[in-house]
Each structure stands twice: as C-alpha cells, then as structure tokens.
C-alpha cells in the first residue's frame, strides 16, 4: 500500500510566500527558500510551489527561486504557475523541479500535457484543477480561479489523465481558505473515475480535515494555512494521522 503524503503549499507572488482566503486578501509570509527549507527539516513529504502571479500577469516562472530551493531541500517538489510551453517546463525541471503543474495552459492547449509527459514521464506531469460546485457538479476555473471555462471538472480530470497527467492537484474553490475541510464529495467522485494519484487541496483547518481527505480517497493532502500559521507542526500532523490508522511516513 502506498504511503499517503502531506504536502505544504507555498503560494508565491512577486517572489514572496503569501496565503490568501478564496484567492483574495494575500498576506506576506516570507522568503520561499527559507519556508521550503523549514518544511523539509520538519519532515514534509513533498512541496508545491505555485507562482500565483505568473499566469495572470504573464510573468516568467520563478526560475531563480526554484534553483535556490533545489539547493536546500532533498525531497520532491512541484512547481506551477505560468507554464505555457514545453520550453517553460524544461527550464523548471533543469532548474531542479521534480514535477511541473499545469492549470490554465493545459485547458487552453491540452497537447501540452502530452508533450511534457512524453518528454519527462507521467510522474513529472501534474494537472491542477480549480473546481467550483454548481448543484450536483463542479465547474472548472482558470487564471488563478478568476475565469469559468465552461467545463465539467470530472470530465476534464478524465481527459487530462488520458493525455498523460500522472497526478491531479484538485482545489475546491468553495472550500479554499475557509478552514472548514476539503470538499470530500469531489474527492470521492474523482477517485471513482481516475486511477492516478490525487492531491486534495482547499479548506484544511484541522488535522481531522487532512485525515478525512485521505480517507475519502486522496493520495496526498495539501495544506497551507495550518502549516504557515504554525497551528500544527509536521511531526504532530504525522503522529495524529498514524494514530488514526492513516498510512503515512
């Protein structure tokens, strides 16, 4: 049985770690290299670095930050934000990223998923889906959660996997930043239709929420606020999950 992973998420804007509630009201949380090193030393399984300004403002992704992070941590990390071409992905992986995460660009050019997975393997190809509930289904949003794209999240997840996505990072926009817990139904529905690892994101406020997401079928639990605000340490988190019977490192 595969170990479940705990993944802190660093939202990076203009070279600093920030955390917003529902993609708004960003607060500065410091230098991404220092924050990444802290989580590595705490025992996180992986990291996700999302350049949340890149896609919206057409910025180049943060190559220098990626190079510096790769020098201080020895665990897998994923980089997303503003990856529009195969060349963008190549530069990030050469700079030290283990995986790249596509969101808006994959919706605009699904072929990019295939191109990256063929060159670097499915294990290096993550597709991030920002999903918002409408009745019994979920719609997909792009450009940092600002634009509805008129696609069903479950169908898009299946298509992304068929094109070569080796992992899906799924954020519930309804839950994001609320600290009320993951959208468990979204995780369960995705688990029924795709066979690649799922990273649950959006809404964690307690350790119980992390456990619920993993028990609902996610392979990894991503969180920001509870770790950035030092509500819980990584060792505390792992101890709680182990005691609950969740298979973690």
Curated annotation (Swiss-Prot):
The active site is at 11, 130. Signal peptide: none annotated. CDD domains: HisF (cd04731). The keyword Zinc does not apply. Its EC number is 4.3.2.10. GO terms for molecular function: imidazoleglycerol-phosphate synthase activity; lyase activity. This is Imidazole glycerol phosphate synthase subunit HisF. The gene is hisF.
